[in-house]
Curated annotation (Swiss-Prot):
It comes from the Bacteria. InterPro entries: UPF0178. It comes from Yersinia enterocolitica serotype O:8 / biotype 1B (strain NCTC 13174 / 8081). This is UPF0178 protein YE1167. Belongs to the UPF0178 family.
Length: 152
């Protein structure tokens, strides 16, 4: 099992949490992006640069993810595909998606797309705050503990 990161849109502060967790636990973290990324030197952190283009990084993650792998993404359709393949999807705010919540999120995303297409300004998400970072770290730790326990 390993951690995949949809890295193009992942906040740097969340990447830092992941880097520390990789070194602390020995869990492999792979950042997938369509641009070069800077990472600290570690045998547990790697980058995978893909071609530019719509959903190229997402498709690469879906192709490589395995059952019980963790994927860090704020992309709802990517999270849905990860769950469909038996993976675990966690957004950078610490929300762990489930088969039930992902359906709700997909419906809301489609509704908001319709609103934007009709010219209504919907705004974006709030800035990532300390509470979000703590929630992410807590959910990551839960997954790491469950995964490490399952491997023993």
């Amino acid at each position: 099992m390993q951690i995949w990161v949809d890295a193009d849109a992942c906040p740097n502060v969340i990447k830092e949490v992941l880097f520390r967790a990789a070194d602390r636990t020995g869990m492999m973290v792979t950042l997938v992006a369509n641009q070069p990324l800077k990472t600290p030197p570690s045998k547990f952190i790697r980058t995978l640069q893909v071609a530019s283009g719509f959903d190229v990084a997402d498709n690469e993650i879906v192709q490589r993810v395995e059952k019980n792998d963790l994927v860090i993404t704020a992309d709802i359709p990517l999270a849905a595909e990860v769950i469909e393949k038996g993976g675990i999807a966690l957004n950078p705010r610490g929300e762990r998606y489930t088969p039930d919540t992902i359906r709700e999120r997909l419906n809301m995303r489609d509704f908001m797309d319709t609103m934007r297409a009709s010219g209504i300004q919907t705004g974006g998400p709030n800035t990532l705050n300390q509470r979000d970072r703590q929630q992410f770290a807590n959910e990551l730790d839960k997954w790491l503990q469950q995964t490490i326990k399952a491997q023993v």
